[in-house]
Structures are given as C-alpha cells and as structure tokens.
Amino acid sequence: MSTKQHSAKDELLYLNKAVVFGSGAFGTALAMVLSKKCREVCVWHMNEEEVRLVNEKRENVLFLKGVQLASNITFTSDVEKAYNGAEIILFVIPTQFLRGFFEKSGGNLIAYAKEKQVPVLVCTKGIERSTLKFPAEIIGEFLPSPLLSVLAGPSFAIEVATGVFTCVSIASADINVARRLQRIMSTGDRSFVCWATTDTVGCEVASAVKNVLAIGSGVANGLGMGLNARAALIMRGLLEIRDLTAALGGDGSAVFGLAGLGDLQLTCSSELSRNFTVGKKLGKGLPIEEIQRTSKAVAEGVATADPLMRLAKQLKVKMPLCHQIYEIVYKKKNPRDALADLLSCGLQDEGLPPLFKRSASTPSKL
C-alpha cells in the first residue's frame, strides 16, 4: 500500500454539470473527459438536425467518427439549455466565429456566468483576422478576465476521446484558479492530466503559431525532406513563438512546456494533425483552394497565418519561418522557392541564452 501523503490541492474535484460550446473533434473529446468528472455534460452545436442525428447514433458522426459517446453526454442546439446549471464552461468554437457567437447568442450566457461566477476554460486556438486578438482576448470583451483560463498542450482529439494518456497545461493569471481547474479537468484514471501555469500569453501564442508551423513541417515532408529538417524547423519555430510571446508581454514559461514545445513537436510530426496534412499536400503541389474544398475539418493554421504576419509586423517581431509559410498559403509561392529563401538567409548565431551561469574560475571540461 502506498504511504504517499496527498494534500488538499491534489484531490480531484467533481461537478454536476459542464457545458462545451463547440462540437468539433476536440470539443467532443473534451466532453468525453468531462463525462468522467460530471454527472451531466452538454455539448452545444448550432444545427438542430445534426444534433438529433448525433444524439440518436450516440456518436459524433460529423467530426469524430468511431467514438461512442458517454451516456451522460447530450448534444443540443439550445444555448440556454446548454449552459443552465453548468459549473464550468468550455469554449472550443473556431476563433473566427467566437465573436459572432457572443454577439448573436451570448447575452443570457454572459449574465449567467457573471452572476454564478462560473469558470470559463478557453480551448480555442488561433488569431482573429479583424482584430489580431487571441481567443481569450475576444472572450474577455464579454466576460470578466478573472473567470477566464486557457487550456493548451499536445492533445490529438482521437487520443483524448479514447482515454489515451494525455498531459496539457491550464493557464490563468491567478495560479490558484489554474490549480482549481487542474483538479476539475484531470481524471481519476489519470488518462488526462493537467499542469498549472500563469503564462496565459505564452499558451495562446504557442497554440496559434504551432498550427502555422505544422503547415511548414508538412510542406517539408511533402517535398521529401527528412527528419533532420523537421527537427530544425521545430526548434527554430519555437524561437519564433518565444519572440512573439515576449513582445506580447508573456513571461515565456509556457514556451518550453507542454503548450509550447510539447504541442509544437506533436503537431509538426503526425498526419493526425490537420495542419501537417494540409502542408504535406501543399508540398506535393496541390493548390490551397482544392485542399480546403475537399476537407471537412478546419485547419486553423491556414486562417491564422495572415493575422499572425500582420501582428508580427505590428510588433516588429521577425518570424522568417512563419513568413514563408504565409507566402506559400496566401501568395501561392512555390514551396521549393520558399525553402530556398529560408536556406539563403546566411550563417547566424543560434540565439539561445545560456541556461546556467558558470564562473570564470570554473572552466568548461569540454
């Protein structure tokens, strides 16, 4: 028998009801996580006929085929029915549709969240085209910032939904808020484990930029480049995430954590990633219009590349990798030419600060 002592902060929290706004693959996967922690989980989807189909088949045949929904998960197209009684609210609506949702349907929901002080977990990734804002910033226009936290990290929907071991970060400006949500979202079987952080900016930047970089990784794969090139892209891309995070005032602690390096490595390395798949097709010569026309799922990196470049320009942050990916997606630049331009940048210092201080009296042994 284990003799390990558990403090109060280690004890998991269980709720009566949770609501997930956003019925895509990831929203459904998070509903499956919450089904282990709540008596009732409600998932909002705007199309009433599709809601009926999902509830009848007990499977999200639209976005997550093959995963049987837990018995305590219900889909609904009624916003008020969805949130009524909820003790936690998750937003997984695509970034470009978030503002429209609040403006059209958010009135009573906003009042409910404020009155009940319901914690809101932002799980959407990207940058809004019209304002260059991240998802938590958009929602922060409608709900008080102290209610908002961010979930980010390496988490393919199919693995989350089927209980394959997953670790993510939950970020809040108040570490105690993050720790409470950590106890709500982490499951008793430890298949879904959350780590708390205060770097909300780093989590949102990393979550958005990694999707653009994953397109680049896919392009390199489509061009027949190897794993060495992928590793270089991941590392240099991580520094672009670091620089943008710094420019936006983040403390950077999330950049080399689960939300940063962890999610970037995953998204850039697997065809389970929609963004990687889009990039691979671009690398093989398919036009972006055809790729998007034949794909049901949203590849957030495509929508993010343009506002990302405008934001970087505004902040005077150099992001050469992301710039070339933008050129491929939006300017129809030949992927091989984009690669050649990257390689012609000349020899440079690596640009990483030392991690350890060494006194002059202690010379290196190497």
Swiss-Prot record:
The keyword Cell division does not apply. One of its GO terms (molecular function) is NAD binding. Keywords: Glycosome, NAD, Oxidoreductase, Peroxisome. Homodimer. It is found in: Glycosome. SUPFAM superfamilies: 6-phosphogluconate dehydrogenase C-terminal domain-like (SSF48179), NAD(P)-binding Rossmann-fold domains (SSF51735). Changing residue 125 to A/M: Loss of activity. Changing residue 210 to A/M: Loss of activity. GO terms for cellular component: cytosol; glycosome. Substrate binds at residues 125, 274-275. The active site is at residue 210. It catalyses: sn-glycerol 3-phosphate + NAD(+) = dihydroxyacetone phosphate + NADH + H(+). Pfam families: NAD_Gly3P_dh_C (PF07479), NAD_Gly3P_dh_N (PF01210). HAMAP family: NAD_Glyc3P_dehydrog. The keyword Oxidoreductase applies. NAD(+) binds at residues 22-27, 97, 125, 157, 274, 298, 300. GO terms for biological process: carbohydrate metabolic process; glycerol-3-phosphate catabolic process. A motif (Microbody targeting signal) lies at residues 364-366. Belongs to the NAD-dependent glycerol-3-phosphate dehydrogenase family. Its EC number is 1.1.1.8. Gene3D superfamilies: N-(1-d-carboxylethyl)-l-norvaline Dehydrogenase, domain 2 (1.10.1040.10), NAD(P)-binding Rossmann-like Domain (3.40.50.720). This is Glycerol-3-phosphate dehydrogenase [NAD(+)], glycosomal. It is an enzyme of class 1 (oxidoreductase).
